[in-house]
Amino acid sequence: MIPLSEMMINLKEDASSNYGDIINRQNKILGNMLGSEIDFLIKGIDNKTRAVAASRKDAMLKKRQIFYLPDANGVSRVCEGRIVQARVLAVAEKTARVEIFGVEYSISARDLSYDWMGDATDSYHVGDQILVRITHVSVTSVSDITVKADVKSVIGNASAENLKKCKVQGKYIGTVTDIHKGTVFIRLSIGVNAVAHSCYDSRLPGKKDEVSFVVTRIDSERNVAVGLISRIVKQNI
């Protein structure tokens, strides 16, 4: 048994926050973590009830001491530029929350992959162990450590190479990953990011729709194919 207070779910409080709100938010975060792998230290054992009391907080602080604080030579195990393993704690549509040796960080979809990603839950799952590259570390004390990381720099970017497969006036099948201010963002099946500013189908495209895309221009600087949606092949209903 691990008390909520020992799960080290730290939320920023403001003047409008109250105790009930904080508890509800913490419970929601815990719900999203179901199935994740965590560390804990045993604090006590009740032989009568065969219950064990434990603390995730103590385990995370211990890992922070080992991996983030400088050793006798003044070197930290986790530093900027290093590739390390992280645990996926929770996944939402546009973000994945990971634990990196006792420190939690939410990686946005744009840092998960160079490929446009409509839904991170399609590629990442609670309990996964992934490689991330540390992009920033700030250590004030063992209880005050912030870290930033990405996944895309580890897996690499094949967009430029895949873009060579695209031809102007070529037709390709793709999936709508996002729509913003009338612009439709598409991930083509040939591994290319594409942008459509118009749709010739009488129906409006929606996220996760499968569409037929016609290339009108290739933007080599941004590694993006520009064009239009000729028709919606399959709607995501």
Where are these regions (language model features)?
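Single-stranded RNA-binding regions, centering on S1/OB-family and related RNA-binding modules
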Residues: 1-237
